Regions:
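Extracellular jelly-roll beta-sandwich "head" domains, especially the C-terminal globular C1q domain
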Residues: 54-204
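Intrinsic low-complexity, repeat-rich intrinsically disordered segments enriched
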Residues: 1-75
């Protein structure tokens, strides 16, 4: 194998297209480990093929859900939701046994969401009066939904989401919910497709 050493490769006068590799080429390597390949400002990279290995990963990421049994929510009491099972947790950043918090150790912007399926033990069609799930950061509410139902519902499934900055060390997220029942006590339904909480880092 021969080696070509030069400073600049350019097209001849009258041509504006350079072809590197032809019918015998299978792989073209640019640089070796530790090298930097600079793309100057104003240059356009036009891709008509398949690009792999670019971009970043949407991690840390997790999704947890309420499992085993429905969770009691005291009447008009803002209660932390105990999402006690994990669908996934890429960086072990979610506590599913004690504080039910997500504390990512990578700084950035995160998309955070929760789905809470609320109902009452009475089970009637007029027993659920009010429901408000909320996402908190470091103990302060940053997003919530309010459903003031009067006396018209048996079950409701509000979804709340927000994009939030996390410092990658001490910032944490958790979910609280308040339910008011005309009759019976408030509850959240368990199940991976019901009451859940998740987040992932956004590539910016």
């Amino acid at each position: 194998m021969s080696k070509l050493e030069t400073i600049t490769i350019d097209t001849p006068s009258g041509s504006n297209t350079m072809q590197i590799g032809s019918t015998n080429t299978a792989t073209i390597n640019l640089g070796v480990s530790g090298d930097t390949i600079n793309v100057p400002a104003g240059v356009t990279i036009a891709n008509a093929g398949t690009a792999t290995g670019f971009g970043g990963a949407n991690t840390p990421a997790f999704e947890a859900f309420l499992s085993g049994s429905d969770q009691d929510i005291g009447d008009s009491v803002n209660t932390r939701v105990a999402f006690n099972s994990e669908a996934f947790d890429t960086d072990n950043a979610y506590d599913n046994s004690t504080n039910y918090r997500f504390t990512p150790q990578t700084a950035g912007k995160y998309y955070v969401y929760t789905l809470c399926v609320g109902f009452t033990t009475a089970g009637g069609y007029t027993d659920l009066a009010y429901m408000s799930p909320e996402i908190k950061k470091n103990g302060t509410r940053i997003a919530h939904a309010i459903f003031d139902l009067g006396s018209r519902q048996r079950q409701i499934s509000p979804y709340v989401a927000i994009v939030v900055d996390m410092n990658g060390s001490s910032d944490y997220l958790d979910v609280f919910c308040e339910i008011n029942a005309n009759s019976g006590n408030g509850k959240l339904r368990n199940g991976a497709d019901k009451t859940k909480f998740g987040a992932f880092r956004i590539i910016t």
